């Protein structure tokens, strides 16, 4: 049964306001709340003894969506979930994930999601994942996502990961392996506040000729929170890779950004950029002259930066 709290979480992490259209799996408090397959997208449980789902998408599937949100509204729920995606050839689809935790108790609530994608030739996947935490209890809200992607020839993935707020601790690991002519774009947006801690390791391995990879990371660290980023692009053939990390630091926060590029081929073209700084005073002043308070001006700038 979906409660008001559950519905609010689903809207925040997956933009759902009712039953999803198409294939979906809604996981709640460690179990399956609802599931639906379609003619082209089959969702089945993992074999006994392993938590999670297997998603199989038929060759040529285009214009369909698959929603797989996770919500935890009970304090003390901890889980490790394995989701495996098998995307056929010549597909063009959207996969919407995300995890929301409401913890009003005194025990830790934790979700560790391990997603593995096998994307077939000339298929294009757009994958989005939002993380959000709330609740007035003393129990922490923890999320540790691991995402591994294998791209076949001519395939692509556009991955957007967003941490909205309220996650006390997160260790995020992402690895994408690109075949010939494949393309991977990772866009990460992250906000931490209070004494929260966030680590993000991202690696794109460009193995095939003419493979392309890009990492775009934007983050805001407020109060006494800490962020550590380690984006890596490895070029093993004629390829192009770009890493761009931009962060805004506020209060007594700490940010470490350690971008790395490795070329193992003379035909690899790799670029990395990283910047950390505070909000410019002239930006605040300009908005305040338009009638905004300093707090409202900061909020407006941060929303635009993370958009």
Predicted ranges, named:
Residues 23-28, 33-285, 289-292, 302-307:
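Conserved beta-strand/loop scaffold segments within soluble protein domains that form the structured core
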Residues 1-25, 30:
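C-terminal functional modules
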